[in-house]
């Protein structure tokens, strides 16, 4: 109880301070009267917000409400492990993802949907507005299995139809679907990077790639890409041919998408992990990008410090940092 009280006090202080949520000190723009604005939260919440499930998600709900988002995209939206343990929850006893309808209502979202769900790490989208599930993407064995699934959703806000694509690509250094005896060789040949390229190609071809006018439609593709971008090479100093750049080079060169964080923070490097790696991204189509007035990686009272749980190896509150976007609806 004391821990929760202190958390609530910190959230209140954050609100009074203007939600200063990054080392840059930039804050979300206050909505004007002329045009409505929406906020979008994107976060890999690590095993269905494992760090707060023993607290009935009270800190998580309080934190989400403090940003008053209109749309949320959550990666790893399934409860996988028992509270404070690295012990799997028995099948059928997982609160999430089926409990998202109840949980989302606690922070003001009456609508939710799930992307393609083929393993323990699906994505979920929640919203103040009705959600149309266009496609649940899992790929196929003959072409490309999308390891953690993906989703294409449409939400109409203030008369504007918005396309949302959620994803979470393969995390390992070796390729998906190979035997344990082949993993070392696959790792040596950057198999994981090439597999993530197959996944992102499949996802884009089956979403924005099907649009007749993607430049002028509103598209947002976001999630945990498990890949680094050549736009951040001022930090990494890799060879430009490095296979770790394959995923984002494809997005930047073969689609109309624009890297939102890079666009709003030219010359800066904003890690989205506890280390020095930006692997969580939000991409917008040109028409939507022109209306993004704020974007940042959140570092606030709750997510500012990522703490390793020594007993399990998991992180608290997550091993990733959230992204926050604000978009003007005009």
Where are the predicted features?
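Active-site environment of divalent metal-dependent phosphoester hydrolases
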Residues: 49-50, 79-83, 118-122, 172-175, ...
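Extracytoplasmic/secreted proteins, especially bacterial periplasmic and envelope-associated proteins
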Residues: 55, 59-63, 95-102, 121, ...
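Structured beta-strand-rich core segments of catalytic domains in phosphoester-bond hydrolases
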Residues: 75-172
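Active-site-proximal beta-strand elements of phosphoester/diester hydrolases
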Residues: 37-49, 135-137, 161-171, 178, ...
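N-terminal, active-site-proximal structural segment of metallo-dependent hydrolase catalytic domains
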Residues: 2-7, 15-106, 117-120, 319, ...
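Active-site beta-strand/loop signature of hydrolases that rely on acidic residues for catalysis
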Residues: 38-45, 63-91, 126, 153, ...
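Active-site-proximal segments of metal-dependent phosphoesterases and phosphodiesterases across multiple
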Residues: 169-202, 226-245
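Metal-dependent phosphoester-hydrolase catalytic domains
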Residues: 136, 209-220, 226-330
């Amino acid at each position: 109880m004391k821990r929760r009280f202190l958390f609530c006090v910190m959230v209140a202080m954050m609100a009074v301070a203007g939600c200063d949520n990054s080392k840059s000190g930039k804050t979300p723009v206050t909505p004007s009267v002329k045009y409505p604005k929406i906020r979008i939260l994107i976060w890999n919440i690590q095993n269905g917000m494992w760090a707060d499930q023993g607290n009935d998600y009270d800190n998580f709900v309080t934190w989400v409400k403090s940003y008053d988002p209109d749309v949320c995209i959550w990666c790893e939206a399934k409860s996988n492990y028992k509270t404070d343990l690295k012990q799997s929850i028995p099948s059928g006893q997982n609160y999430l993802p089926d409990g998202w309808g109840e949980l989302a209502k606690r922070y003001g979202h009456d609508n939710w949907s799930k992307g393609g769900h083929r393993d323990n790490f699906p994505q979920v989208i929640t919203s103040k507005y009705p959600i149309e599930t266009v496609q649940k993407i899992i790929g196929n064995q003959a072409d490309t299995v999308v390891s953690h699934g993906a989703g294409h959703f449409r939400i109409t806000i203030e008369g504007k139809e918005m396309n949302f694509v959620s994803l979470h690509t393969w995390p390992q250094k070796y390729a998906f679907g190979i035997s344990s005896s082949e993993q070392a060789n696959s790792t040596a040949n950057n198999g994981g990077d090439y597999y993530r390229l197959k996944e992102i190609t499949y996802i884009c071809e089956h979403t924005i790639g099907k649009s007749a006018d993607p430049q002028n439609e509103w598209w947002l593709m976001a999630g945990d890409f498990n890949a680094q971008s050549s736009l951040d090479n001022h930090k990494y100093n890799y060879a430009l041919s490095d296979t770790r750049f394959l995923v984002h080079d494809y997005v930047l060169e073969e689609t109309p998408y624009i890297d939102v964080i890079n666009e709003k923070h030219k010359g800066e490097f904003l890690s989205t992990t506890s280390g020095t790696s930006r692997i969580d991204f939000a991409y917008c189509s040109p028409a939507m990008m022109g209306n993004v007035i704020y974007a940042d990686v959140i570092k606030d009272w709750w997510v500012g410090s990522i703490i390793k749980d020594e007993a399990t190896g998991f992180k608290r509150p997550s091993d990733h940092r959230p992204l926050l976007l604000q978009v003007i609806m005009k």
